[in-house]
């Protein structure tokens, strides 16, 4: 599978992809995937690296009052987003797909989302009150539903 094949497989569902995915996230991932394959990085290592970025983003968002941390959180989430696509592309490119890898990917995604919402909640609730937790729970529920719907549409 060549460079173009990696890009095509990542954009096979264009109608459900966002502009940033199509024009930034997937193209960067399509360039990174063959490099990681040559370096013999495992898809699960990519998933876990993405999860580490997500957890660090949650910590950075907890400190969002300092604009440097807010920017760091954003940058870490962009890296997570790229790695979240690369792990599957790498698994397909190197023929290392597995059910265990899918589970690791799902856990990594959920740990990332919980980390971000938790970081924001811990930062905002002392200032704005406990209603922040209800709002974040609602946002997390909506996010989970959107992610599940996206995955179902992507697999069709």
Whereabouts are the PLM-identified features?
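Topogenic membrane-insertion module of multi-pass membrane proteins
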Residues: 1-74, 78
